[in-house]
Amino acid sequence: MTQTPANSHAIDSALLGLEDDESGSRIVREELKLLSTVKTALAGARARAEAPDEPKDDARLLEIREEISTARPDDLPALLEQMHNLGALRAQRGKGVVGVVDPNSPYFAHLRLEEDVPNGKPRKRDLLIGNKGYVDSASGVRVVDWRNAPVSKIFYRYVEGDDYEEELGDRIVEGRVLLRRSVAIVGGELRRVSTPEGVFLCDAQGKWRRLDPTRAKLRTEGTKAKLGDSNADGLTRADKVLPAIAAMIDKEQYNLITRPGTGIIAIQGSAGSGKTTVGLHRVAYLAETDPVRYRPERMMVVVPNEALIHYVRRVLPDLGVDGVPVTTFRRFATRTAVGLFPKLPLSISEETPTVVTRAKQHPGMLRVIRDAVEEMASDVRARLDAFADKWAGAGTVVKAWDKTAGDALKVRLTNLSAWADGNKDLGVSAKSLSQATCSALEALLTDARKQARAVLSTWDEVLTNRGRLATHMPDLNEMQMNQVHAWCVRQMRVRAEGERDGETPSVDTEDFAILLRIWQELRGALLGSDEKPMRFTHLLVDEVQDASAVELRVLLDLTGKEPAATLAGDVAQRMLDDGDDRGEFKWSDLLSELGMETAAIDPLKVSYRSTAEITSFARGVLGPHAHDAEPIATRHGPMVELFPFSSQGEAVAFLADALKELYASEPNANVAIVARFAQQAQVYFEGLERAEVPGVRRVAKQDFSWEAGVDVTDVRQTKGLEFDEVVLVDTNAASYPDAANTRHALYVGATRASHQLWCIASDKPSVLVEEGIKAAHALVQPAS
């Protein structure tokens, strides 16, 4: 039975809600009629596909294929022609198109073109843009694929009323865009029509209304929307990336900045609360107040990504501090480990199982390393006990050894040797030792020092001692622990034996931190490229919620036995991959693992970056994982919007129009298009590039230019960054299911926006987004 046309009763009667809107009624009627035609064509194609002759066609096709497999070469052309003709007949009946085109959402745009015809009258034709191509000549329906059909470029590159000239295939086509509309078709029903005349929306009860046109506009903050040129406020886009943050410091932040440089300061703050601002000003303050102790080269800033390296390197000189090393932990650890271990494989594994990464970043890894080194120290103590029993007057050796506790193993051995030679005071006298006893002791210590220098073999032992790993990682079940152990054993064997069975010796990224920590426990201070001990007087470590305890312990030990560091982080911004069930970040747990239970946690409560609307949305997204205290926003802005679409192509079309309109009025705007995953970002980048959106850039490796334009990226690339406007794309239920890690990811993406935030769904919207929108709308609006 043929399907009833969508909203058929509305085509020939007054449109509910648009009774007094003549132009709106005309536009919506046209689109309802067009959808009815398309649905009728699809229904007819489906009916033909189900015709009684179809099984016979299928059987004959199978027979021809069987004949082809055994046919003589001379018979092949005729058989192939038969198969082609039969396939064409089946296609005409509808099979092959009905199964591809989604009848519930067959297209998302309507284009009417007037093409110039050489030596003839211009020809008008209507095109529909969808996710799949479909042509029905009899009914005049033509749907083209938005990604592949050359003619779809006209829709993305031109607006209604434009003259166009495009190379389509092997010919140049010229003409005019008479009509250009975007539509939303959900469940086979027309729900939205977007035109230059207005946006028309149909609710669940079938009532149409014109949408407030400002909802679908991206706009910059305050006077910026009125600037119109890059010099209206005397600042280029690059200058605006570096605001005069000194003028924004509040009393709470000032108290943190001016603390003494020794000890640990742990700063907890929501996104945009000024954690990084405080940290950088603290570095500048220390350099100013004690320039000898806190020389720039004796401090270091550690940030989570390359983009923040560029940002910090530009901010610090503006604060009067030049020459402070700025790095990521990965960059620092890789460079240092390669220098310390020349024989270490340079190949980084790209196949590391998630559970192995989790184990190597586990807080318990610190205890695993410590236990391994303590076992080695206990072995030395046992050998010294036996030595004292054998050699006369050697009892003082054990007492002297115990006095060295607290230092790295090799340092302890070296100090004991110096004590025996009379060059080190350990609180007991070595005068009772005979020359023979001293010689025997030195032989023992020389052998022990060889073991203490063996960092690589200790590393292998640490990672392959299943019992020790299981003891300190009780949250990993037996199956997970077996996988971790098997991976580490295999890596060790390949490194020992060289390339085997096509496997190349490799390390995991997380191994660098483990190696450096083992070095510190066994040999003491890390060595720089000049082979001198690395020592810093103060460290700033940003986004610590994403760092492992091993990484932080490595960094803190760079400042000596009494750590001096500013740690900045946010419990809500921990980024975990799907399947990583490490749970919520807790400052207390981290500080306990680091042996700093007494360190105070200083909260920052004011959100300076984002508007109250964005802050409320972000808090709603976090749900049960939100901060204990509501962040205090300092200003209001546009409402956070959710725009649902039925496909990525429809979303790209809408977004391209909005971005073009924005840059026509505000060329200095800096917009981030942020997807959950890199693959999604690539689809939107290609679509916007195809639509010729000005200044569109694909950012895949934190290579932000900090210039005006559109950065298309994924959420992991944006940690710690800020943009005027942010559009979160594919905020679908599939991309952001209700899980702790997805709540945090969505929170991070949303809080990159300083002024305006949009969410675009190309399928069923995520319930997390809907919760955030509800929270934002619950906000009490200021009086106008």
Which sequence ranges carry the predicted segments?
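A structural signal for short, well-ordered beta-strand segments and their strand-loop junctions
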Residues: 108-112, 266, 567, 758-761
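Phosphate/oxyanion-binding active-site loops and adjacent basic polyanion-contact surfaces
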Residues: 241, 245, 275-279, 507-511, ...
